[in-house]
Amino acid sequence: MELTREEVAAPGRANLSQLLAALALGLVVFVGVPLWANDYWLNAILVPFLILSLAGLGLNFLTGFAGQLSLGAAAFMSVGAYATYNLLVRVPALPLAVDLLLGGAVSAAVGVLFGLPSLRIKGFYLIVSTLAAQFFVVWLFTRVSWFSNDDTSGVLSAPALAMGPWRIGTPASRYLFVLGVATLLFAFGVRLVRSELGRRWMAVRDMDTAASVIGIPVGRTKLLAFALSSFVLGIAGALWAFAYLGTVEPDGFNLNLSFQILFIIIIGGMGSIGGNFLGAAFVVLLPILLSNSAGALGALGIAEDQLQNLQKIVFGTLIIVFLVKEPDGLARLVQLAWQRWTAKEQE
């Protein structure tokens, strides 16, 4: 059977369209947004959106792709933040990029340490183990003054950031810095989940006993998931402290943040790279939408001081809906909508 000229050219046209779409998106996010977005959008929406997307990527490595449940995401973020802070303060000669990588490496080492129980336990018991990491790390940073450079206040001002001559002090520069780091790590994530290690993670997630039978080193595969997940979370934690909060403190990495990151991957889609953006957008925008709808909600008898409780109710309801009706999250819904739209276009 011979292919027609149109059938041969179709894949090339598709690749060209994807390339042009990627270039257009790059121009918008790297050039258009810094030029046109105001400081509120950059500081309060876009920067936390990018960092939480990155944190979702880290947790997705562990939970979405490798199937290891965790409630300690914020703990590993705090390790990365404190490690990077100490490197910046104690070894000022190191470039910022090296500080971030070393902070992520320290977080990866701690992640492997708390991942050791995964060699023996799973499910609910593993969740409890990672939850212990959350409480232990916060206690450690609160009680041991060395981590906070012997500062008695417990709240450290984030040091000024710079990469060579570039001073990262304005909202636009912080946005571009976070965007650059997120772009690199997401590109790394795409390559990783398509690699042999990514396939091993999914085999362990689906059935670790069968994975062991076919020769996959289950223990090492799980620990690599903890290491790489914590590495990304550690870098996200440093960005969270330096580019968003402006401070380094244990309260900035509480259990609520761990739940938020878990909600991101459940709502966005476990085992999905793009779903991290969708879940993070939902987590960041929902409180803003509820706050802006305070007047309309007040007419329904919902007081303004009850908005936070309403937010929790909405999150809880959506978690149940997605787990029962669509475990693959918003990413799957978007994919189905795109397939229907392209099918209509071809008719």
Kindly give the residue locations of the regions a language model identified.
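Transmembrane alpha-helices and adjacent helix-loop boundaries
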Residues: 1-347
